[in-house]
Amino acid sequence: MSRTWCQTIAAALFICSAPIAAASAGENGLCEREMARAARIHGIPLGILYAVGLTETGQRGALHPYALGAEGQTLFARNVSEAVTSFETMRQKGLRLIDLGCMQINHYYHGSNFESVQAMFDPAKNVDYAARFLKELRAREGSWTMAVARYNAGPNNDPAQKRYVCRVVANLVSSGFGAWTEQARSLCQPRTT
């Protein structure tokens, strides 16, 4: 991945690197409450964690603990029982890459780090795992921008990483945790003439 576009986006992500209060829109939500705790415990900027969560399961400004994502589609189950049943149905249909919970943790790659599928839908466990994973990615990659890029798209997928980072930055800005920098705007927003 080009370090140039990463450095451009870093300016936008840097804005939210100071400790900040929980997002008022999600203060009563299960996922949001756990984000404030995980950000504090793991030293992750809440704005980044929240913007990643919004990108993953955000709908009308709230995150969803019982979301499932597979093959580009997201299903919002009403409760954990319905979510687990939906997961089992997806698996019976042959789907392997299924993302679960508040932060859409991929079961295929990360499921062995949880005691069960049901545990992956637990907001405290899901968000805590995502926070630790982002922190690990930042240590390995050297910046929050690259950590965010790798969170969803993994390595060797520059176009998907760029799209994902731009979506996270847009959510960072729309949630009030950051502001567009000129460099981030020029990278993420197509010019209209």
Label the model's feature ranges:
Residues T8-A18:
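Bacterial N-terminal signal peptides
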